[in-house]
């Protein structure tokens, strides 16, 4: 076993002499409208949208899950349509309007979809919740009277290991009723609080590794 490992190491070392290192991509100015605010950041030309939103813009509600487009927790809206930010180059959506979970609330007050997720137990561990909220809001923006099947199709790309999905469907139906004006939104559990880290990744009091 050790001899085999040594032979493989020699092959790697010999082969590496003929490999030219790929140069690092150039940094470029990336601009978009994120949650209603024009932003311009310096990012590598090959950066994915997920990295730019988290590490450059500071919207840490966009979660990194699988990096393969299978879990949905990185979902954002691009010009009103849900999109997986882990599979999207930032350059592909430059100069678009992007909405992350931070952009759903009205100031410090929760959006109906957020309030209903809290009211109906649509969130447990919470890691998948931002993606579900974005997918659900994109649906409600186009259809405020969805069937359960409509909802199932809209959240088909979002995975949750906690809730069993029924509470999520109930949460979205509750928000749909609010959008239709049939019921009042749930009362907030507490007075709204301001963002404790308004500067995102540049906030000096953020814990180490906060943007990863």
Descriptions of predicted regions:
Residues 2-195, 199-212:
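Signature of N-terminal electron-transfer/Fe-S-associated modules in redox systems
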């Amino acid at each position: 076993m050790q001899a085999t490992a040594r032979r493989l190491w020699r092959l790697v070392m010999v082969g590496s002499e003929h490999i030219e290192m790929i140069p690092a991509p150039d940094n470029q100015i990336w601009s978009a409208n994120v949650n209603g605010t024009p932003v311009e950041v310096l990012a590598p030309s090959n950066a994915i949208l997920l990295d730019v939103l988290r590490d450059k813009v500071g919207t840490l509600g966009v979660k990194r899950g699988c990096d393969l487009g299978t879990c949905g927790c990185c979902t954002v809206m691009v010009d009103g349509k849900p999109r997986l930010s882990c599979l999207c180059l930032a350059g592909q959506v430059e100069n678009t309007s992007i909405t992350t979970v931070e952009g759903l609330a009205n100031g410090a007050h929760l959006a109906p979809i957020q309030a209903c997720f809290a009211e109906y137990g649509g969130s447990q561990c919470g890691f998948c919740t931002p993606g579900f909220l974005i997918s659900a809001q994109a649906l409600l923006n186009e259809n405020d009277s969805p069937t359960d099947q409509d909802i199932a199709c809209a959240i088909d790309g979002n995975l949750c290991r906690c809730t069993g999905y029924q509470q999520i469907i109930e949460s979205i139906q509750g928000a749909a009723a609010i959008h239709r004006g049939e019921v009042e939104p749930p009362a907030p559990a507490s007075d709204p609080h301001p963002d404790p880290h308004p500067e995102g990744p540049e906030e000096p009091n953020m814990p180490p590794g906060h943007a990863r």
